C-alpha cells in the first residue's frame, strides 16, 4: 500500500466504509468525526503519531478533540470492536482459521500509565518499564489480523485501588493472569460463533493444563506450545515428561518440514509426534509433538495437540507454525497502523486506541486480501503450509 493517489483513495473509501459500521456507537457528531480522523492519521505516513501530529493531519487547531475522543467522551470501545470483528469475519472468515493468543509490550516512561511497571517485554527482549497487552489474532486463508485485546494489570496495580482509580480503572477490575485473559477471549470467540478450527499459543499460555482441559471439554482443537518439563498421561505413567518421549524414537519417525516462511526463508525443522492418553474417545487423538532444530539437534521444542483422529502430522505442523502470524500482526500494526503510537494513560484510553488501531489493521488486511484475489498483490501469500524443503532453520 503505497502513497499514490489511487491507494489514498482506496484507503479513504475503505476506512470510511468500516467507520460507518460503528458510527452509531457515538452519540454526538464530534466523536464520530474524530474517530475517522484518528484512524486516517494512524495510517498516514507521519514520522511521529501523537495528539499534535494527528490533529494537524486532521486539520484541527490542536489536540483537544483527539484527547477528548480517547479520554473523556463516553463511548464503549468493546462495542466498536464487536463491529470491527464482524467486518473481519465478513471479509476474512474461514472455517479452517486459527485463533492465536500472544502478548506484546509497549515501552513507557513514568509510573502513571495504567498497568505500567518494570516487567519483561518481548518487544524489548528484556525487563523494561512497559505496559503489556494480551491479544487474539485471527489467521485464515485470506489474511490475518487482531480481533481482541486486553491490558494486563499487574498486582502492583490491582492491590492499590487509589492508583487504579487515578488511571480510570474501575473497582470491579481485579487481577487476572494473562492466561485467564486469553481464555476469556477464546470463550468470547466461541460464543460469538466466529468461524475457526484451531487454537494455538506459545508456551507461556500452552503450559496451562487447565486451559488445555477447558478447550478439550469444549471440543476445541488446539496445538499449544509447552515446556520440556510438562507432563502427560501415557500407557506407562500418569505424569510422563514430554521430553522423555522422543529419545528412543526411530529415525524414520522424524519428518523434515517447513512450518512457514520467516525473515530468512522457510522455517525448516525435524518433526515427530507421539500419541498419548490412548483411552479417549475414538474420533479424537492427543499427541505430543517435538520440533527439533536441523542445525542444532539438541534444541527441541514441544507442543500438546488435541485433534480429530484423521489429522496428519503436516496439518499439526501448519497449525504450530501459524503462531508466527500474530508476530506479523504486531509488526505490521506497529509499523503501519500506529498500534504503539499513543500517549494515553487511562485504562479506557488504552483500549480505545488499540481498538481504532486494530480497525486500521483490519482494513489494511482486507485491502491486501482483495489485491491477492485480483492477482495484484506484491506480498507473500497470507498462509503457508508445511512441505518437504531442503532449507534449514536459521
Regions found by a protein language model. Name each.
Residues 2-200, 204-221, 228-231:
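Conserved, well-structured functional cores that handle cations and Mg-NTP chemistry
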Residues 16, 125, 141-167, 171, ...:
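An anionic, glycine-rich sequence signature occurring as long contiguous blocks
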Residues 24, 28-31, 48, 195, ...:
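Intrinsically disordered or highly flexible coil/loop and linker segments, enriched in small
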Residues 101, 105, 205, 311-344:
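Short amphipathic alpha-helical "interface-anchor" segments enriched in bulky aromatics
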Residues 132, 299, 325, 352-358:
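Catalytic-loop motifs flanking and including active-site residues across diverse enzymes
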Residues 208, 234-235, 353:
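Short Asp/Glu-rich motifs
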Residues 332, 337-394:
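Basic, amphipathic alpha-helical segments enriched in Lys/Arg and hydrophobic/aromatic residues
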Amino acid at each position: 500500500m503505497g502513497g499514490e493517489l489511487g491507494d489514498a483513495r482506496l484507503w479513504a473509501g475503505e476506512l470510511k466504509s468500516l467507520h460507518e459500521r460503528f458510527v452509531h456507537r457515538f452519540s454526538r457528531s464530534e466523536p464520530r468525526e474524530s474517530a475517522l480522523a484518528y484512524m486516517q492519521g494512524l495510517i498516514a505516513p507521519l514520522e511521529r503519531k501523537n495528539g499534535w501530529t494527528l490533529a494537524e493531519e486532521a486539520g484541527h487547531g490542536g489536540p483537544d478533540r483527539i484527547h477528548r475522543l480517547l479520554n473523556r467522551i463516553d463511548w464503549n470501545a468493546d462495542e466498536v470492536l464487536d463491529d470491527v470483528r464482524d467486518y473481519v469475519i465478513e471479509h476474512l472468515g474461514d472455517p479452517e482459521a486459527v485463533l492465536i493468543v500472544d502478548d506484546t509490550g509497549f515501552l513507557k516512561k513514568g509510573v502513571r500509565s495504567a498497568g505500567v511497571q518494570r516487567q519483561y517485554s518481548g518487544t524489548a527482549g528484556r525487563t523494561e518499564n512497559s505496559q503489556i497487552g494480551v491479544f487474539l489474532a485471527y489467521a485464515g486463508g485470506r489474511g490475518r489480523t487482531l480481533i481482541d485485546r486486553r491490558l494486563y494489570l499487574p498486582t502492583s496495580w490491582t492491590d492499590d485501588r487509589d492508583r487504579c482509580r487515578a488511571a480510570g480503572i474501575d473497582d470491579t477490575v481485579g487481577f487476572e493472569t494473562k492466561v485467564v485473559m486469553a481464555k476469556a477471549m477464546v470463550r468470547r470467540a466461541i460464543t460469538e460463533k466466529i468461524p475457526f478450527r484451531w487454537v494455538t499459543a506459545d508456551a507461556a499460555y500452552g503450559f496451562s493444563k487447565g486451559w488445555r482441559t477447558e478447550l478439550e471439554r469444549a471440543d476445541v482443537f488446539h496445538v499449544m506450545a509447552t515446556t520440556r518439563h510438562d507432563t502427560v498421561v501415557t500407557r506407562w505413567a500418569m505424569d510422563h515428561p514430554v521430553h522423555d518421549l522422543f529419545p528412543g524414537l526411530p529415525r524414520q519417525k522424524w519428518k523434515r518440514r517447513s512450518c512457514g516462511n520467516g525473515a530468512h526463508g522457510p522455517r525448516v525443522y525435524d518433526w515427530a509426534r507421539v500419541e498419548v492418553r490412548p483411552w479417549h474417545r475414538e474420533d479424537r487423538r492427543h499427541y505430543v509433538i517435538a520440533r527439533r532444530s536441523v542445525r542444532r539437534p539438541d534444541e527441541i521444542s514441544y507442543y500438546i495437540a488435541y485433534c480429530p483422529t484423521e489429522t496428519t502430522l503436516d496439518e499439526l505442523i501448519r497449525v504450530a507454525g501459524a503462531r508466527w502470524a500474530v508476530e506479523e500482526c504486531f509488526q505490521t500494526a506497529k509499523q503501519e497502523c500506529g498500534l504503539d503510537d499513543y500517549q494515553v494513560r487511562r485504562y479506557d484510553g488504552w483500549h480505545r486506541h488499540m481498538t481504532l488501531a486494530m480497525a486500521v489493521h483490519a482494513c489494511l488486511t482486507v485491502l491486501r486480501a482483495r489485491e491477492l484475489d485480483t492477482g495484484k498483490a506484491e506480498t507473500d501469500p497470507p498462509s503457508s503450509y508445511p512441505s518437504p524443503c531442503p532449507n534449514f532453520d536459521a
